[in-house]
Amino acid sequence: MVVKFTKSEALHKEALEHIVGGVNSPSRSFKAVGGGAPVAMERGKGAYFWDVDGNKYIDYLAAYGPIITGHAHPHITKAITTAAENGVLYGTPTALEVKFAKMLKEAMPALDKVRFVNSGTEAVMTTIRVARAYTGRTKIMKFAGCYHGHSDLVLVAAGSGPSTLGTPDSAGVPQSIAQEVITVPFNNVETLKEALDKWGHEVAAILVEPIVGNFGIVEPKTGFLEKVNELVHEAGALVIYDEVITAFRFMYGGAQDLLGVTPDLTALGKVIGGGLPIGAYGGKKEIMEQVAPLGPAYQAGTMAGNPASMASGIACLEVLQQEGLYEKLDELGAMLEKGILEQAEKHNIDITLNRLKGALTVYFTTNTIEDYDAAQDTDGEMFGKFFKLMLQEGINLAPSKYEAWFLTTEHTKEDIEYTIEAVGRAFAALANNK
């Protein structure tokens, strides 16, 4: 059991003097779980972390999803080391980027052409530009609660109604940009239709997380994605899948392969980099030919397609091609789900658990979670207490009630068994303090 965070606390105090908020991404702070110093990690191996105080954790954060093969996987580490020895940045075409592009196309047939960038935010941002160039329209639709990166183009919240033009969700985002975004509830065909009836003639594209990962793991209702394609295409707009979280996480070919629905454009990131910074986007040939140097939609990047990220990504996909890997993730996920639900019943703790294969979210509520409104209406204070109890048990989770638990290929049944026991102790403590 973890008992001290002395060095993490000291390091955070020092970080506050030099780094904004002491963190380089706000999701890493503990603000959403009651505050305190975030735990600083020193090294990772397989399914485990060790912090600066020497405490060991079973990791279910997985860097918010990318580390599907576990930390410091030897095949990926070797590829990165070799790339570093050969020079990590050229500013020229390489054989590695061609090989990796071919691998992505083979995995995801909807990608006639691809282009590499440096992050999921960049990938989404550019698909929007390409969609606007192709359609000649300006408005974008998205689903409430679905995060598509921190660019001005999509950092908006829903208004008071389902088809209301967006309002900025961050200082510094001009109202003029936010007004180009229309937000509708996920899993609701009727409100989508209403919005398209009103704004469809101005809409360039709709951004879709085919399986939601940013207000927990939420699957689309049967037939929902098919209806999205139908309605959006009828309006003359494009369908963009944001598979930054989902690609290669639930199935090798991404959510579009798992669900059997094809988008016009796809944004990728996270898993495809094997832990290094990366993004990619692609889609139908006639749409992608809008991108410079072939077309008028400009996109460039000094670091785009750098050899280190290409080598890491290739190695990661090679690992993910191993037979039985996704079946193992599903099996461990089912085992963890069953154990958590049993512990909740045993200790009379109200939870709803959403799981798809090797990813799940525990919500402190009895309500079904199918959209963002339902996810918001869950007990964040209870989650914060649970999070810190699990940290004391040596279990590393994301510090937010909206985030998923991600399994890796390196988790074992013994890890799951210990985690279930730890959940039981945490639930017992919560029950005693009700």
From Swiss-Prot:
It holds the Pfam family Aminotran_3. Coiled coil: none annotated. Pathway: Porphyrin-containing compound metabolism; protoporphyrin-IX biosynthesis; 5-aminolevulinate from L-glutamyl-tRNA(Glu): step 2/2. Its cofactor is pyridoxal 5'-phosphate. The modification N6-(pyridoxal phosphate)lysine is found at K270. It is found in: Cytoplasm. GO terms for cellular component: cytoplasm. Signal peptide: none annotated. It catalyses: (S)-4-amino-5-oxopentanoate = 5-aminolevulinate. Its EC number is 5.4.3.8. It comes from the Bacteria. One of its GO terms (molecular function) is transaminase activity. Its main location: cytoplasm. Keywords: Cytoplasm, Isomerase, Porphyrin biosynthesis, Pyridoxal phosphate. GO terms for biological process: protoporphyrinogen IX biosynthetic process. NCBIfam families: hemL (TIGR00713), PRK00062.1 (NF000818), PRK12389.1 (NF009055). PANTHER family: GLUTAMATE-1-SEMIALDEHYDE 2,1-AMINOMUTASE (PTHR43713), GLUTAMATE-1-SEMIALDEHYDE 2,1-AMINOMUTASE 2 (PTHR43713:SF1). Belongs to the class-III pyridoxal-phosphate-dependent aminotransferase family. HemL subfamily. Homodimer. This is Glutamate-1-semialdehyde 2,1-aminomutase 1. It comes from Bacillus cereus (strain ATCC 10987 / NRS 248). The gene is hemL1.
